[in-house]
Design a protein with these regions (language model features):
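Conserved beta-strand/loop scaffold segments within soluble protein domains that form the structured core
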Residues: 135-137, 141, 145-430, 444-472
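Short, low-to-moderate order helix/coil transition modules at the start of elongated helical scaffolds
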Residues: 2-252, 256-262
């Protein structure tokens, strides 16, 4: 993510153009638009898949063709798979040095601040451009601890092939929903992380996903395995320039958290307003382990995103902290799911949503407590801030409690910006637009404080971008 050096940023100073960079089309190869067996086989050939993966793709395609589109949530009628290009290979192979990445691609990531962030505060970086990872590197001292951080194709065709086969799409099977099946058929790119038992990766790893091609889809797969007693913070960033045609993001994240291990997965999504973001994220947590999700959703035309945690071992814990900002023409349907599948597990879901200019920001939660999960606790809290009379925010909680000896609660709040607070800040010298942006930033502060400082600043600047033009 781009690291801004000043603590205070006026609304007028935030530059949207860094995200709207459009590189000239220069793909080395791309498949035809649409989706059929020939296209899936072509992708598999381009990827040099082992036989089992080729078969997996074709079975996923059959599942995709047999499943209906979900009949709940935002409308995706504007997404026509006949017009989506599912694989675009950039004009470079993966590199281990930024100096070796072609200038047009490198310049895009430079403007987004990825190399700078790597030098300042990251243990390793992966950068994907369209359908392929173009850069991947991990610091030597981290690799020396036995940590594996590489693109997933290298792991699939290398020494970690069996580990990939054992875990790939086991948490999110193609039968999960239609777009999971689509992902299974056409996935490309993404990262593989393995942290050995007892190893603490003290500074974060990051993957950044950039979709440049108009009318294309991005289907990266991130697989993270953190062994017993280990720790990892993984950061995911994404962006794309805006086009007049639909783009699709249907990635997948699978996280395996070992006994007494801890994983934090932070995401700042800034997709363009023509993007359909239909991403699936899931974690399985063993005894005494912890999964922490931190999520910021600021872009896309339509989003369906509900990270799910399966608390499989006694004392496993999940925390989800998220913020969503929906503006004009956006329908963002987000939230979190948790399954308490063992005794004395706990979950805490905290979300904040902001809507303006007719935007729709919905929150969904699903808490399931299985019969063997006695002593478990779950708390769900969501707050919504409406900036006008045209916007909409709904809370849709689900609770499936199959055990008596549990403590489960849900609370929801909705409010508006206080005009008295705006007047006070204006009396202290702020413009009305900056005053409103400051109040919204304060509303989002509990989420920002969960991020490393560079990313908290980035999130606040994205809020400022969304607030531009909020007056009048």
């Amino acid at each position: 993510m781009r690291a801004f050096e000043t603590e205070k940023t006026d609304v007028a100073e935030v530059d949207r153009s860094i995200y709207d960079i459009k590189d000239k089309p220069n793909a080395a190869f791309e498949v035809d638009s649409g989706l059929d067996k020939a296209i899936v086989e072509q992708i598999s050939t381009e990827k040099h898949d082992p036989d089992w993966m080729r078969d997996f793709r074709l079975k996923s395609l059959d599942i995709y063709n047999s499943m209906p589109v979900q009949n709940w949530g935002p409308s995706i009628e504007g997404l026509d798979m006949r017009n989506i290009v599912t694989y675009v290979r950039p004009n470079t192979e993966m590199r281990g040095k930024w100096s070796e990445v072609p200038d047009d691609i490198k310049n895009t990531f430079e403007r987004l601040g990825i190399p700078k962030a790597e030098r300042a505060s990251l243990a390793g970086v992966g950068a994907q451009y369209d359908s392929e990872v173009v850069y991947h590197n991990v610091k030597a001292e981290v690799a020396a601890q036995g940590v594996v951080y590489t693109d997933i194709e290298s792991a699939l065709n290398g020494p970690y092939a069996e580990m990939i086969r054992t875990h790939f799409m086991k948490l999110v099977p193609p039968t999960d929903h239609k777009f999971a099946a689509l992902h299974g058929a056409v996935w490309s790119g993404g990262s593989f992380v393995y942290v050995p038992a007892g190893v603490h990766v003290e500074i974060p790893l990051q993957s950044y996903f950039r979709l440049n091609a108009p009318g294309a889809g991005q289907f990266e797969h991130t697989l993270i395995i953190v062994d017993k007693g280990a720790y990892l913070h993984f950061i995911e960033g994404c962006s794309a320039p805006k086009y007049n045609v639909a783009n699709l993001h249907a990635g997948c994240v699978e996280i395996y958290v070992g006994e007494n291990a801890r994983v934090r997965y932070s995401t700042i999504e800034n997709w363009s307003k023509n993007m359909y973001n239909l991403n699936t994220k899931r974690a399985k947590v063993e005894k005494g382990g912890t999964i922490e999700w931190v999520s910021g959703s600021f872009g896309s035309h339509t989003s369906c995103l509900y990270p799910m945690s399966i608390l499989a071992g006694e004392g496993a814990r999940m925390e989800f902290t998220g913020i969503t900002f929906a503006g004009a023409g956006q329908d963002l349907d987000t939230g979190a799911k948790v399954v308490h599948a063992a005794p004395n597990t706990s979950s805490h879901i905290t979300t904040k949503s902001i809507a303006r200019d007719g935007g729709i920001s919905n929150f969904r939660s699903a808490v399931t407590v299985l019969p063997n999960a006695a002593g478990s606790k779950s708390a769900v809290s969501c707050e919504s801030l409406m900036l006008d009379d045209q916007s909409r925010s709904d809370t849709i909680p689900e609770m499936d409690i199959r055990c008596d000896a549990v403590d489960v609660g849900h609370e929801a709040k909705i409010g508006r910006i206080s005009e008295e607070a705006v007047f006070y800040l204006m009396s202290r010298g702020l413009s009305e637009e900056d005053a409103r942006a400051l109040i919204v930033g304060g509303f989002a502060e509990p989420i920002a404080k969960e991020l490393p400082v560079e990313y908290a600043v980035e999130m606040n600047n994205l809020i400022h971008l969304e607030m531009k033009g909020s007056i009048g």
